[in-house]
A protein has these predicted regions:
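Conserved oxyanion/phosphate-binding beta-strand-loop segments in alpha/beta enzyme cores
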Residues: 1-36, 71-75, 102-105, 285-323, ...
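Flexible, glycine/threonine-enriched loop-and-boundary segments that flank and lead into catalytic domains
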Residues: 214-219, 224-242, 290-316, 460-493, ...
Length: 649
């Protein structure tokens, strides 16, 4: 007797839905279990086998917890704003709302066909006005608390998508969305001050059950370092160049400085620079390079000495040359660095190329061959000579810097403030107004949600402005403070916005008066177990932890951390062992498997295909093996049932 999945699975899936057996009960007397999976982006391609693996582990845990007497919340929703839908809308002329609704309907039917035990009464959609009202509300609270600011800066810009990208969305110099080359462009950018929460994000990792590699990735992403800010005078002008260094003890070995090509001191003192034509030509070349290209460690060292300006080493008074070089960025640190070529390989290579002095200040290597980056006894360093422990020499130098007023201890982070605006249509409108009298003003809370207007042209302007900028009825408004004619902000939020708090809305998805009721939050939060992909442990998880910490400080949520536990699933590779992609023709459609072998076979195979956290190639033979196993289970069950019937008769 075989497992008759085409008869059995639809029957029980219908009964589950009719009886609402997977709906969670708020404030139950039972112990609670909140299992969370990363809600999907409802693409036109629909569900893939990666979704099956991502959801199957907590699906099993959730069913087990229900059998153990827990009140289980296992929700699903859709992270539906984003560029792919908008690009498809531009291509086809179909409104993103229509595309999104169709994709969500198809995706929901697919999920139900696979038999997941989601609570379908709590489905959320980030493009729903009742949802993004609260995304906008959180943004306004951040604006009130000074966590939102605007700055004109060089940004990562995708010419194909016509959108500004954060550093996180343009790694490797490629657009995360379309994989086109990213260019640098000067634009006004809205930022969220995530760096103000850097220490809380680091401290919070001590209180959660995350895999070590997840914690380490987040620690590395935040990139906290302790060091010193030091001021270098510039000879002949009333100006100081501030640098940050983690090794202030090596100041006696500084033989040159490097500043970013965009550093304002260049234009400010252009009349004193005798090779301004050469400087300008080099700056123009740098402007053509992406941040990724500029900061690559393995590349030819380029730079130009600034003739007419010299720095002064603050600890020994020696004059040192100042260069501009592409590897120094204004967005990192102070836009200026001190160079110690004897003990930093990049500085060493630069010094060798340009014939700059190399002074050893730490014994232990052969600086005629390469930089020495290890520890050792301090030499050629005046009051530090003889110090052998790095910690002691740094502390002594900090004392000297602070005593003389030329520097102080400080902290820097690799993580930068979050670039938060996009010049596209299909995203949450940023609820701010530009008034000629009052400056930037918040949209009043009672006017939320600030709705997306209906448009026919979704294409961004050639000037890089959002499609919303073309709609006068949306742009032109009245200042809520002074009543003057004003203009709305026309940029929209990035796709990461809606996913930064969605786990809270699941606890109270139909609340019109708050993002969630505090009693329900106290019952359900924190999430007991969150499963997802390794690709989201930095951006999404750090962003959502940041928002949650902010809401906790605001008194809106009851826990500082949103997720008590995190697990990671590995990729499902194609049968050929390569990553699945349409271009390679190795994509496996999960619904084809459901149709041929059944949903239970598919989920059984995904759970037994190998180490859950490892990348594993798809095997059709193993799928067949799982179906044979279920056939044997069915045969035993049918035999057992017939025996019972015989005894009963």
């Amino acid at each position: 007797m075989k497992y008759l999945f085409k008869k059995i699975e639809p029957k029980w899936q219908a009964k589950w839905e009719e009886a609402k057996v997977f709906e969670a009960k708020d404030n139950s007397d039972k112990p609670k279990f909140y299992g969370l999976v990363e809600f999907p982006y409802p693409s036109g391609a629909g569900m893939h086998v990666g979704h099956i693996k991502a959801y199957s582990s907590l699906e099993v845990i959730s069913r087990k917890r229900r059998m153990e007497g827990y009140n289980v919340l296992f929700p699903i929703g859709f992270d539906a704003f984003g560029l792919p839908t908008e690009n498809y809308a531009v291509k086809t002329g179909t409104h993103p709302r229509i595309i999104t609704d169709e994709n969500i309907k198809r995706f929901s039917n697919q999920l139900k066909k696979v038999g997941f035990s989601f609570d379908w009464n709590r489905v959320i959609d980030t493009t729903d006005e009742d949802y993004y009202k609260w995304t906008q509300w959180i943004f306004l609270k951040m604006f009130e608390k000074g966590l939102v600011f605007r700055d004109r800066t060089l940004v990562n810009y995708c010419p194909h998508c016509k959108v500004v990208l954060s550093n996180e969305d343009s790694q490797g110099g490629k657009c995360d969305i379309c994989h086109s080359d990213v260019v640098q462009k000067s634009k006004d950018v809205w930022y969220l001050r995530i760096t103000q929460y850097a220490d809380k994000l680091l401290e919070g990792l001590k209180d959660v059950d995350y895999p070590d590699n997840v914690k380490q990735q987040q620690i590395h992403w935040i990139g906290k370092s302790k060091g010193a800010f030091v001021n270098f005078d510039v000879d002949g002008i009333d100006e100081k160049l501030e640098i940050y260094t983690t090794r202030p003890d090596t100041l006696f070995g500084v033989t040159f400085m490097v500043i970013a090509p965009e550093h304002p001191i260049i234009d400010k003192y252009a009349d004193k620079i005798t090779n301004m034509d050469e400087i300008t030509a080099y700056r123009n070349e740098c402007a053509k390079k992406t941040e990724f290209e500029r900061t690559q460690l393995v590349k030819d060292k380029t730079g130009v000495r600034i003739q007419g300006l010299e720095g002064i080493n603050p600890v020994n008074g020696k004059k040192i040359p100042i260069y501009i070089a592409d590897y120094v960025m204004m967005g990192y640190g102070t836009g200026a660095i001190m160079a110690v070529p004897a003990h930093d390989q990049r500085d060493y290579d630069f010094a060798k190329k340009f014939g700059i002095d190399i002074i050893e200040v730490i014994k232990g290597g052969d600086i005629s061959k390469e930089a020495y980056t290890g520890d050792g006894e301090m030499v050629n360093s005046d009051f530090l000579n003889g110090y052998a422990k790095k910690k002691d020499s740094i502390e002594r130098m900090l004392e000297e810097l602070e005593k003389k007023g030329i520097g102080k201890a400080g902290v820097q982070y690799k993580m930068k403030d979050w670039a938060f605006n996009r010049q596209r249509y299909w995203g949450e409108p940023i609820p701010l107004i530009h008034c000629p009298n009052c400056g930037v003003v918040a949209v009043p809370e009672n006017e939320l949600p600030l709705r997306l207007p209906d448009v026919k042209d979704f294409e961004p302007g050639e000037d890089g402005q959002s499609p919303l900028a073309k709609i006068d009825s949306f742009v032109n408004c009245t200042c809520p403070k002074c009543g003057a004619a004003a203009k709305r902000e026309t940029d929209t939020m990035p796709q990461w916005a809606g996913s930064s708090w969605y786990f809270l809305r699941y606890t109270d998805p139909h609340n019109a008066n708050a993002l969630a009721d505090m009693d329900k939050l106290k019952y359900w939060m924190p999430v007991d177990w969150y499963n997802g992909g390794m690709e989201h442990v930095t951006r999404h998880m750090i962003y959502s932890r940041f928002w949650h910490h902010f809401l906790y400080d605001l008194g809106v949520v009851n826990t500082p951390e949103p997720y008590a536990k995190r697990s990671i699933q590995g990729l499902i590779l194609g049968p050929d062992g390569d990553k699945m992609s349409k271009s390679k023709g190795n994509v496996v459609d999960p619904l084809d498997i459901v149709e041929e072998y059944g949903a239970d076979t598919l989920r059984t195979y995904v759970l037994f295909m190998g180490d859950y956290g490892a990348a594993t190639p798809w095997s059709e033979n193993s799928v067949k093996g799982c179906k044979k196993f279920l056939d044997r289970v069915a045969a035993v069950s049918y035999t057992h049932l017939r025996a019972h019937e015989t005894l009963a008769n």
